[in-house]
Swiss-Prot record:
PROSITE patterns: GLC_GALNAC_ISOMERASE
Source organism of the structure: Tolumonas auensis (strain DSM 9187 / NBRC 110442 / TA 4)
Active-site annotation: 72, 141, 143, 148
Broad class of enzyme this protein falls into: hydrolase
Domain of life: Bacteria
Full protein name: Glucosamine-6-phosphate deaminase
Summary of subunit composition and partner proteins: Homohexamer.
Length: 266
């Protein structure tokens, strides 16, 4: 597993956007052979989305032959709800690039049969040949997507009850009122993520430092679902200085030495 320790959130956003754009361009997608990209929501990826939009506007990347699958969605929120992940993605990314509407896939938290919705999502990913690159963030408790602590590391797309810590973290999007935060969500599973050809996880801020430590220095542990990346042949964590604060000095220096050519660009 790689870890790229950058200076700040701005560098993390710029580097990750260029990385995603490079992967798309190297793949040279067509309508018959699209690049399948997994996407997150939340505060961490916003800078990446801003930079991807700039790259698109500059003609450096096109999303015309990209198919996306979002990681998760709240149960019970309509697509036009201000805090739905549908709304987040269109407001912050999709409305600003050239991706066709039919190429966008987001779980429907208002589906009449939620289990069928999850099964259909998995089936569509499989039909398209799997996800090439899954881009995501990590929670302060180490969760990826809504795979909360103690999630099965072989889990698939399913309904998930959110932990108190996640509800508190997300209350900032609901007028700081934890009672407004939905208690259930639909989420891709850890197994779904691990099936991707490549996983790119971003971690920024002091509140992500314990999660980064668990992912890099800890053992594979279902209480820190991000630690499953240790088992992936192409797992990459990109973080800022604040998110490395719990790492041992020798661990941080090791990755700084490994990634010296990349770090020298910034």
């Amino acid at each position: 597993m790689r870890m790229l320790p950058l200076k700040d959130k701005a560098q993390v956003g710029l580097w990750s956007a260029r990385y995603i754009a490079d992967r798309i361009n190297q793949f040279a997608p067509t309508a018959e052979r699209p690049f399948v990209l997994g996407l997150p929501t939340g505060g961490t990826p916003l800078t990446t989305y801003e930079q991807l939009i700039k790259l698109y506007q500059q003609g450096e990347v096109s999303f015309a032959n990209v198919v996306t699958f979002n990681m998760d969605e709240y149960v019970g929120l309509s697509a036009d709800h201000p805090q739905s992940y549908h709304r987040f993605m269109f407001d912050n990314f999709f409305n600003h690039i050239d991706i066709p509407r039919e190429n966008i896939n987001i779980l429907d938290g208002t589906a009449s049969d939620l289990l069928a919705e999850c099964a259909a999502y998995e089936a569509k990913i499989t039909t398209l040949g799997g996800i090439k690159l899954f881009f995501g963030g990590v929670g302060s408790d180490g969760h990826i997507a809504f795979n909360e602590p103690a999630s099965s590391l072989r889990s698939r797309t399913r309904i998930k009850t959110l932990t108190q810590e996640t509800l508190i973290d997300n209350a900032r999007f609901f007028n700081n009122d934890i009672n407004q935060v939905p208690k259930l969500a639909l989420t891709v599973g850890v197994g779904t993520l691990m099936d991707a050809e490549e996983i790119l996880i971003l971690a920024t801020g002091h509140n992500k430092a314990l999660a980064v430590q668990a992912a890099i220095e800890g053992s594979v542990n279902h209480l820190w679902t991000v630690s499953a990346l240790q088992l992936h042949p192409r797992g990459l964590i990109v973080c800022d200085e604040a998110a490395t604060m719990e790492l041992k000095v020798k661990t941080l220096r090791y990755f700084q030495q490994l990634e010296a050519p990349e770090l020298a660009k910034y």
